[in-house]
């Protein structure tokens, strides 16, 4: 162990070199801080073992020498540019780990208590994989001790012996590759997506810085080895994994374009699976991280510590897939920027991952009540300003006297507020009843029931107010109201409460003046007073119900029905008398008329030009035919002579009638003549009626 310290120096010297490297490169310190989250999640036992392995095992650069010279001497890949990129990638990773070791040393004392529990689990995990690594580790330690000496001595001059040593080391690594792969598949590979992305980003940033100092490169390689050893797994697994990655990088340099495409496809599928896994793990991150969250300073550390709590199977599967993805990214020349861009597009920035859980899902602070709008109830509510309007109101002082009484006037008393004027005075009102201001029915009495006042002049000519009412207070304390000739008893009673006030009206407002404490009531003094009598009469009239339906006795027949019958008989008698008078008048007029005229016999053929004796009347023919038939019917009767005489008389009357009608037609004109002809035909059809009328007339004349 003394030889190892002489070769590599003590831990204090390594820490001093780390500080110098930190001050030398400021840009590398930022990614180093990001990667320190996973180092803090490791256990103290791992750190102890890492210190031992760091003292025993050499760094990658000491084993293999400079990558650029290795590529030139070995002729495995045949391309100098690819080896230079792999060298730059490893150099960048080493520079990143330099800062991580410093942060781990600072936080080592604070995280010892938290890593004790994880130490037991890591020891159990390392025990499962110790057997397959024992042989490889033994051979590696023996070979590495010699190689480190050669690497330290030949680093300054870059001699050919270093290339030969590198070739021998490569052969040893090829022999141990199968064993390392088997141990890697059985063990756990706790690598996080954030570290891989940081490694890819650091590769781009450090491509221009590949000519840094050899001393810093060796220190960076040691820090890189410690970075992988600080993870919550065994040191042998991480060292073997590092060596296997270097060997695979050399093999991938010689692969063709088809191999690079296949590795890119596998990397894309692995990234998709990891993305789904990270989305499912975001929900349980707060519960699983627990104590680790308190030691992290930013959101990226939270995501890395959350990855350390995953199950063993998921971590192992992710480590194998990410190893392939990282190898393909380091080997590819043109596809490396595109792969980094795809990874950043898939996973995003670490700040974006934790921003949603920190800000959006943060519960409200207890003890602060919130209202429906999300505002604190403790905040004072804004009160609306009061609107004040200054108004000047004159103060009214009234002389209310010594005593103030509240009076509710009964219905038999009333007060006239206006002064009495004989010119407009009305003794009695037309309406017997009226409604007061309160809607009660009030009796309209005469002067003795209305309190009035007036203004008159005294002997000196001064105005004096008189009233027809006064209150008299007797020696026993009782009072009475004298209103004209009527006397009313006055009763005093106290008022309960301050609910009755005296106000003075001013425009639309009221101004209070006093508070009533006593009330007065009035009653008639005796039942003999006029007020009492009139009041009782009004009550009697109000109580007596008027009978709206009258019942009359039915003696004999209904006089209305008899009256209607008598009116009908009287009308019939008048019509009969009028008819007789008209018939008698006609008979008298016909006696003075002449014989028949041809003008009226033919009303249908009447024409002024065709007037003459040659025209024949149809009515005359009909009468002639009827007369002959009646004569034949009377042959067998015993009264044939009498009938013949009657027929002669009728024919004469008819002829006279026709003559009179004809003369009237000449006077009235053509239109009136046609109307009369129609009336004559109607009369001819009513011949028996004419006979009856004529018989009656003859009987009356005989009488």
Swiss-Prot record:
Coiled-coil annotated residue ranges, if any: 242-279
InterPro entries given in the database record: Leo1
Bias type Polar residues, positions: 74-92
Signal sequence extent: none
Basic and acidic residues composition-biased segments: 53-64, 105-116, 123-188, 197-317, 557-572, 578-592
Single annotated GO MF: RNA polymerase II C-terminal domain phosphoserine binding
GO biological process entries: positive regulation of transcription elongation by RNA polymerase II; transcription elongation by RNA polymerase II
Protein keywords: Activator, Coiled coil, Nucleus, Transcription, Transcription regulation
Family: Belongs to the LEO1 family.
Subunit structure: Component of the PAF1 complex, which at least consists of cdc73, paf1, leo1, ctr9 and rtf1. The PAF1 complex interacts with PHF5A.
Protein name: RNA polymerase-associated protein LEO1
Organism annotation: Xenopus laevis
């Amino acid at each position: 162990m003394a030889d190892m310290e002489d070769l590599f120096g003590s831990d204090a010297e390594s820490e001093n070199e780390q500080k110098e490297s930190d001050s030398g490169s400021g840009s590398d310190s930022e990614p180093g801080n990001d990667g320190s989250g996973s180092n803090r999640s490791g256990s103290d036992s791992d750190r102890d073992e890492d210190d031992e392995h760091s003292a025993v095992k050499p760094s990658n650069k000491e084993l293999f020498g400079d990558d650029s010279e290795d590529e030139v001497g070995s002729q495995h890949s045949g391309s100098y540019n690819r080896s230079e990129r792999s060298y730059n990638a490893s150099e960048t990773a080493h520079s990143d780990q330099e800062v991580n070791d410093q942060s781990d040393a600072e936080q080592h004392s604070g995280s010892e208590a938290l890593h004790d529990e994880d130490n037991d689990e890591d020891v159990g995990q390392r025990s499962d994989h110790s057997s397959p690594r024992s042989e490889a580790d033994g051979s590696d330690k023996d070979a590495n001790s010699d190689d480190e000496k050669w690497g330290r001595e030949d680093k300054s001059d870059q001699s050919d012996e270093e290339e030969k040593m590198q070739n021998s080391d490569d052969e040893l690594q090829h022999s141990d590759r199968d064993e390392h792969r088997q141990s890697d598949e059985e063990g756990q590979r706790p690598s996080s997506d954030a570290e891989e992305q940081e490694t890819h980003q650091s590769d781009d940033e450090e491509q221009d810085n590949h000519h840094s100092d050899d001393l810093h490169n060796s220190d960076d390689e040691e820090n890189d080895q410690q970075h992988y050893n600080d993870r919550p797994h065994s040191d042998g697994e991480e060292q073997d994994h590092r060596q296997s990655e270097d060997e695979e990088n050399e093999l991938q340099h010689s692969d063709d374009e088809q191999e690079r495409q296949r590795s890119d496809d596998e990397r894309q599928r692995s990234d998709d699976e990891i993305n789904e896994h990270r989305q499912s793990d975001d929900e349980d991150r707060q519960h699983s991280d627990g104590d680790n969250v308190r030691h992290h300073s930013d959101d990226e550390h939270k995501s890395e510590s959350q990855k350390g709590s995953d199950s063993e199977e998921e971590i192992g599967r992710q480590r194998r897939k990410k190893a392939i993805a990282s190898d393909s990214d380091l080997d590819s020349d043109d596809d490396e920027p595109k792969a980094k861009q795809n990874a950043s597009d898939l996973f995003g920035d670490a700040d974006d991952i934790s921003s949603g859980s920190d800000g959006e899902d943060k519960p409200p602070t207890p003890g602060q009540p919130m209202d429906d709008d999300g505002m604190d109830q403790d905040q004072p509510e804004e009160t609306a300003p009061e609107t004040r309007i200054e108004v000047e109101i004159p103060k009214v002082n009234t002389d209310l006297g010594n005593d103030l009484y509240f009076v509710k006037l009964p219905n038999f008393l009333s007060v006239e507020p206006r002064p009495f004027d004989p010119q407009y005075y009305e003794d009695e009102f037309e309406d017997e009843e009226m409604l007061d201001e309160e809607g009660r029915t009030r009796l309209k009495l005469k002067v003795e029931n209305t309190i009035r006042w007036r203004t008159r002049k005294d002997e000196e000519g001064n105005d004096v107010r008189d009233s027809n009412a006064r209150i008299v207070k007797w020696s026993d304390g009782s009072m009475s109201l004298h209103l004209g000739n009527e006397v009313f008893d006055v009763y005093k009673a106290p008022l309960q409460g301050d609910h009755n006030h005296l106000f003075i009206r001013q425009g639309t407002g009221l101004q209070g003046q006093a508070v009533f404490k006593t009330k007065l009531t009035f009653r008639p003094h005796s039942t003999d007073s006029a007020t009492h009598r009139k009041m009782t009469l009004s009550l009697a009239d109000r109580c007596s119900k008027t009978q709206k339906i009258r019942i009359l006795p039915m003696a004999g027949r209904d006089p209305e029905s008899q009256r209607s019958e008598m009116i009908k008989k009287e009308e019939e008698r008048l019509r009969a008398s009028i008819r007789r008078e008209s018939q008698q008048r006609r008979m008298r007029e016909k006696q003075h008329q002449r014989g028949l005229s041809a003008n009226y016999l033919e009303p249908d053929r009447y024409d002024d030009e065709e007037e003459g004796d040659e025209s024949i009347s149809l009515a005359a023919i009909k009468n002639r035919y009827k007369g002959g038939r009646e004569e034949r019917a009377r042959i067998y009767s015993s009264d044939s002579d009498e009938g013949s005489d009657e027929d002669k008389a009728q024919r004469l009357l008819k002829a006279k009638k026709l003559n009179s009608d004809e003369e009237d037609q000449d006077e009235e004109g053509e239109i009136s003549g046609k109307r009369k002809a129609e009336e004559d035909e109607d009369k001819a059809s009513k011949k028996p009626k004419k006979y009856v009328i004529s018989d009656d007339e003859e009987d009356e004349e005989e009488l």
